[in-house]
Amino acid sequence: MESSRLRLLPLLGAALLLLLPLLGARAQEDAELQPRALDIYSAVDDASHEKELPRRQLRAPGAMLQIEALQEVLKKLKSKRIPIYEKKYGQVPMCDAGEQCAVRKGARIGKLCDCPRGTSCNSFLLKCL
């Protein structure tokens, strides 16, 4: 009985190895038939295809003004350029000696800048001394 199990085990393993490529090919065909979410959205930032909200869905009379104000803010944020010192972490612009500065630790009051060599930002006066 034990010898028949030992003979059957390699045969089952060989059959499984032969069937695996066939099962993998079928799964690959199924994956190719499914639509991809990336194909639905275009890479172009064109807002002309976006839907407008129907006016009956707007409940407040000032809602249109709020939407227009938000759209203006979004346009400004898109056009705003980030200063180089904000992009590079750990690097901030230099302050002049005696100018108001900000401490990097804790709550910060004042302009974010680093004091020149030989001076340090006084946390009480918030000036480069």
Curated annotation (Swiss-Prot):
Q: A Gene Ontology molecular-function term?
A: neuropeptide hormone activity
- Modified sites of kind Phosphoserine: S48
For biological process, the GO terms are: adult feeding behavior; cellular response to starvation; chemical synaptic transmission; circadian regulation of gene expression; G protein-coupled receptor signaling pathway; intracellular glucose homeostasis; negative regulation of appetite; negative regulation of bone resorption
Top-level taxon in the UniProt lineage: Eukaryota
Q: Which residues carry this modification: Phosphotyrosine?
A: Y41
Indicate yes or no for the key word Coiled coil.
Answer: no
For whether the record's keyword set contains Nucleus, the answer is: no
Q: Which residues form the signal peptide?
A: 1-27
What intrachain disulfides are recorded? C95-C113, C101-C121, C115-C128
> Which of UniProt's keywords are assigned here?
Cleavage on pair of basic residues, Disulfide bond, Neuropeptide, Neurotransmitter, Phosphoprotein, Secreted, Signal
Annotated Gene Ontology cellular components are: extracellular space; secretory granule; synapse
Q: Which CDD domains match?
A: CART_CTD-like
- InterPro entries tied to this protein: CART (IPR009106), CART_C_sf (IPR036722)
Q: Which family does it belong to?
A: Belongs to the CART family.
Task of the protein = Satiety factor closely associated with the actions of leptin and neuropeptide y; this anorectic peptide inhibits both normal and starvation-induced feeding and completely blocks the feeding response induced by neuropeptide Y and regulated by leptin in the hypothalamus.
Q: What is this protein called?
A: Cocaine- and amphetamine-regulated transcript protein
Which gene name belongs to this protein? Cartpt
